[in-house]
Amino acid sequence: MFIIAGPVGAGKTTFYEAYLKEPFPTLVPALRHQQQPFLDERRSFAVEDIRVDTQLLDQAKAAGYSTKVLFISTEDANLNVGRVFVRMSRGGQAVPVSSVIDSYRESTKSLSEVPKLADELLVYDNTAHRRGFRIVAHFIGGKLSKTAQTIPDWAAKVFGKELHAVKQHEKLGRGR
């Protein structure tokens, strides 16, 4: 099971369309009653939401699923607002500015818990929209296994302690 999370306008659907649609053709809405049949029938699926639903992670793990979370964000909520306006101008769903900004604030609220709950967490920055998704951190089995050279502020606020520890370890390793 994949959960693709992040604020409105961060690029979740774009990521899904480019990388996950073929192996996970069903993108289930973030509505519990629509996810339950997949869990009951033990079918693979992907969920897109603003925040990572930690209860869904627990439920999926209890049902024997391998759980992978992809979190995508940008450095600034105003960038997301601009992207949503572009999407709306092309016939996409209208989203109020306040909802985009609120989603930016809400999206990281439970994110620091996810490495302990999911089998794998990949954290992406999509600030440089045309340059693609940049991996910021990769957690496997609750442990940070990989980080980018530069960490965006939004990710440092969520995973600061873990990222700092890895950077210190890397510095010590180079000094030998």
Place the predicted regions along the sequence by residue.
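Conserved GTP-binding G-domain of TRAFAC-class P-loop NTPases and closely related GTPase folds
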Residues: 86-175
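ATP-dependent NMP and nucleoside kinases share a basic, alpha-helical "lid"
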Residues: 50-90
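Switch/connector loops and helix/strand junctions flanking conserved nucleotide-binding motifs
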Residues: 12, 76-83, 130-134
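Conserved substrate/cofactor phosphate-moiety recognition/catalytic segment
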Residues: 13-44
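Anion (oxyanion) recognition and catalysis
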Residues: 39-40, 58-63, 115
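The conserved Walker
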Residues: 7-8
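Short catalytic-loop micro-motif centered on adjacent basic/acidic residues
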Residues: 44-49, 68-71, 95-98
